[in-house]
Amino acid sequence: MAEEVPSLNIEEWKPRTSIGSLVKEGKISSIKELFDRNLPITEPEIVDVLLPKLKYEVVDIKVVQKQTDAGEISRYKVLVIMGNMDGYVSIGTGKAKQLRVAIQKAIRDAKMNIIPVRRGCGSWQCTCGEPHSLPFKVVGKAGSVEVDLLPAPKGTGLVVGSVLKTLLTYAGIKDAWSTTKGETRTTENFVRAGYSALYNTYKFVTLQDWVRKR
């Protein structure tokens, strides 16, 4: 179930990086401007300012063991998917003895991993021109898992695995097909492969990009 990402108190935020200072001073006023200038997200508060009202969902919880001098210590490992359901998405992981703390760490990690997702109408069966799907086929890999995401006609829906469906929904993609290879039962690698594929939507320069640059 989607939950709203808790934001930090921006008034009390003291930036630790030059990019954070630019954001707090209003010299960078949108997340799009940040990515257009090829600047990294160096503090989670940057996302709180530039991309408010994000939502997240916990998609995987594991209990992992760590060997110490005192013996094995059990901790929770949490994987979350985060996005604004309108072109920005992220994933994050967190580990802690308490589940609540692990989720908080995963949310913080996800804020640092926000990426823009290029949307479009790339299916030859659809000519609506609306950003309901992907503009072209993209491929992502993580571990042994490979995910191919393909554009689909409007109204098709998300014909993908359940976890991948969550990822695409948070990215704002409504119609898509997918093919997968490898050990897709490993939830984290499956999600990371899908995230990698979405990241690759901006590795290609389209005709529209050339027109905008001119």
UniProtKB/Swiss-Prot annotation:
GO terms for biological process: translation. The gene is rps5. This is Small ribosomal subunit protein uS5. With S4 and S12 plays an important role in translational accuracy. GO terms for cellular component: cytosolic small ribosomal subunit. The lineage of its organism: Archaea, Thermoproteota, Thermoprotei, Sulfolobales, Sulfolobaceae. The N-terminal domain interacts with the head of the 30S subunit; the C-terminal domain interacts with the body and contacts protein S4. The interaction surface between S4 and S5 is involved in control of translational fidelity. Residues 54-117 form the S5 DRBM domain. Signal peptide: none annotated.
